[in-house]
């Protein structure tokens, strides 16, 4: 690679494509790919990664009696109520963004128009996760974050299969 060519490429790296075309009219343009080459095959929804998390979530639910434990400890700890309220707020904002703003109003980039919605949703969801960890800590001890994260990933991967 010769030095003048490298300097010229370095100089052109921040130019807009139209400026680059004007700058190098004498150079030959590479062929543009056809529509068939541009069209990429969509990724399959069910892959090894999502299958693993869904299966792991099912195994965790079965072996730790997740729903039975949740039902027995629901009324004994106030962290469940606080975590549930935060989770409700987080999911409400998410549904507001997806259903109302994107589907009904047609705002595709709602995160640009309303930049505080995504951080608020994320913060409330993380706070809800911390509350659920505190509520179930006396049951599973240091396994609680691992079990809840596995459940979370299983739900996320299952939802990704649906849509």
From Swiss-Prot:
Bilayer disposition of the protein: Multi-pass membrane protein
- Look up the signal peptide feature and give its range: none
GO CC, any one term: membrane
Against InterPro entries, the record matches this protein to: TMEM128
* Chief subcellular location: membrane
Location(s) in or outside the cell:
Membrane
Which sequence ranges are marked TM in the entry? Answer: 47-67, 79-99, 117-137, 142-162
| Keywords of this entry | Membrane, Transmembrane, Transmembrane helix
What PANTHER family has UniProt attached to this entry? TRANSMEMBRANE PROTEIN 128
Name of the protein in question: Transmembrane protein 128
Provide the species name. Answer: Mus musculus
Q: What is the lineage of its organism?
A: Eukaryota, Metazoa, Chordata, Craniata, Vertebrata
